[in-house]
Amino acid sequence: MAEQGTAERLIEVALAEVGTVEGPKDNETKYGKFTKADFQPWCGSFVNWCANEAGVKVPNTVYTPGGAAAFKKKGAWIDGDVADPEPGDIAYFDFPSDGVDRISHVGIVVKDNEDGTVWCVEGNTSGDAKGSQRNGGEVCKKLRAFKKNKKGIMVSIVGFGRPKFGNFTNTTSKPSGGSASKSAKVDPKIQAAIDLLTSKGYKITK
């Protein structure tokens, strides 16, 4: 086992979860139970759970725009188009043409391929390229892109946050569901409903 509080340990924990499937109810997972956000889209809960198991400090939120905003506030963020990601970084996604024009998914970088692509472990995604990439119900290891690349992988990573390593004891209190910025505050239950509807093809207008 890798040393607690390290990127290696975070990756080890995440990889051990690959193959986990939600259920029996929709969006029901041990990750959501840990963050007290069960039965909601759980990619953020997965990252928080893995970080807690590994003793790594990440933003205390399951709302993906809020997590990105927190990393930016701490100066621990780098945009994808200029990034040099490292294993253990937290990747934030905005999938083109999925009906949600904002950061809407998060995962853990396990390897940088040094060609504009990375391998990530993500909760609540799909192993099938045709399945929902941000509400797919599985923990999967995925090949993702943050820059244009010769592999032809679609660019979906907006940027990366770098966690604080050092064997932290995280609490199991409910992470904030809101963003760190006033402009992005959304009730997590409402946002979860919006994301579910848009993933099924419904158009949500303001």
Question: What is each model feature region?
Answer:
Residues 4, 101-186, 194-195:
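Aromatic- and glycine-rich peptidoglycan recognition patches
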Residues 48, 68, 194:
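Short glycine-/small-residue-rich flexible loop motifs, especially phosphate/cofactor-binding loops
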Residues 191-194, 198-201:
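Residue-level detector of alpha-helical secondary structure
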Residues 20, 71-82, 152-155, 202:
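Short glycine-aromatic motifs
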Residues 182-185, 199-205:
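Cationic, hydrophobic amphipathic alpha-helical membrane-interacting segments
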Residues 1-56, 155, 162-179, 205:
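N-terminal capping segments
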Residues 8-11, 56-130:
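...with weaker cross-activation on analogous glycine-rich loops/strands in unrelated enzymes
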